[in-house]
Amino acid sequence: MENLIIYLLAYLIGAIPFGLLLAQIFAKTNIKNAGSKSIGATNVLRVVKESNPKLAKTLAVATVILDALKGVLPILMAKFYGFDDNILWTMAVLAVFGHCFSPYLKFEGGKGVATGAGVLAVFLPFEIICALLAWFIIGKVFKISSLASLGAMIVLIATSFIFHYDIPVINTHAPIFIIAFIVVYKHIPNILRLIGKQECKVI
């Protein structure tokens, strides 16, 4: 029962739509009705930038940080209280699932990139550093957020087999692949636009 409560909390906290809330509170804008209609930092930047470019950058950065922390903090708290990595990895997956399929938004949500990066940073810090470098380079060259995110995810998966061929305690890369699958699934419209060379440049 205790584990079920922890899992539920990880999901519900991960489901908090910080991007949507920040845009509504500070920019008086409903990002669910504009841009890509996603609740993530990229859409916050895209939509709010039309009326207030400076505020857009601030809110986008805040969204990234909060979306990452909502996955990280529950895991760190559970780790502090002695829960093992099997439970912590399950919490990580549920946090990303909550962000992407939020019960507060009729099970819609964001793309899971910031939350996924946050939870994976707890377990795979070196891999996340490599992924962030890839995200920065791809974003700088192509200026397409979705392409940078997908490229970074590929780098993370590849480097996870280099730095952690056997994931400690759980001895499987399954949670990483589940998180990656969720992120790719939420990026399907972006992937189709990338193939059709219609994806918008943002970063």
Curated annotation (Swiss-Prot):
<keyword id="KW-0808">Transferase</keyword>
<keyword id="KW-1208">Phospholipid metabolism</keyword>
<keyword id="KW-1133">Transmembrane helix</keyword>
<comment type="similarity">
    <text>Belongs to the PlsY family.</text>
</comment>
<comment type="subunit">
    <text>Probably interacts with PlsX.</text>
</comment>
<dbReference type="GO" id="GO:0005886">
    <property type="term" value="C:plasma membrane"/>
</dbReference>
<feature type="transmembrane region" description="Helical">
    <location>
        <begin position="5"/>
        <end position="25"/>
    </location>
</feature>
<keyword id="KW-0997">Cell inner membrane</keyword>
<keyword id="KW-0472">Membrane</keyword>
<dbReference type="GO" id="GO:0043772">
    <property type="term" value="F:acyl-phosphate glycerol-3-phosphate acyltransferase activity"/>
</dbReference>
<keyword id="KW-0443">Lipid metabolism</keyword>
<feature type="transmembrane region" description="Helical">
    <location>
        <begin position="87"/>
        <end position="107"/>
    </location>
</feature>
<dbReference type="GO" id="GO:0008654">
    <property type="term" value="P:phospholipid biosynthetic process"/>
</dbReference>
<feature type="transmembrane region" description="Helical">
    <location>
        <begin position="58"/>
        <end position="78"/>
    </location>
</feature>
<keyword id="KW-0444">Lipid biosynthesis</keyword>
<keyword id="KW-1003">Cell membrane</keyword>
<feature type="transmembrane region" description="Helical">
    <location>
        <begin position="118"/>
        <end position="138"/>
    </location>
</feature>
<feature type="transmembrane region" description="Helical">
    <location>
        <begin position="150"/>
        <end position="170"/>
    </location>
</feature>
<comment type="function">
    <text>Catalyzes the transfer of an acyl group from acyl-phosphate (acyl-PO(4)) to glycerol-3-phosphate (G3P) to form lysophosphatidic acid (LPA). This enzyme utilizes acyl-phosphate as fatty acyl donor, but not acyl-CoA or acyl-ACP.</text>
</comment>
<keyword id="KW-0812">Transmembrane</keyword>
<dbReference type="Pfam" id="PF02660">
    <property type="entry name" value="G3P_acyltransf"/>
</dbReference>
<feature type="transmembrane region" description="Helical">
    <location>
        <begin position="176"/>
        <end position="196"/>
    </location>
</feature>
<keyword id="KW-0594">Phospholipid biosynthesis</keyword>
<comment type="pathway">
    <text>Lipid metabolism; phospholipid metabolism.</text>
</comment>
<dbReference type="InterPro" id="IPR003811">
    <property type="entry name" value="G3P_acylTferase_PlsY"/>
</dbReference>
<protein>
    <recommendedName>
        <fullName>Glycerol-3-phosphate acyltransferase</fullName>
        <ecNumber>2.3.1.275</ecNumber>
    </recommendedName>
</protein>
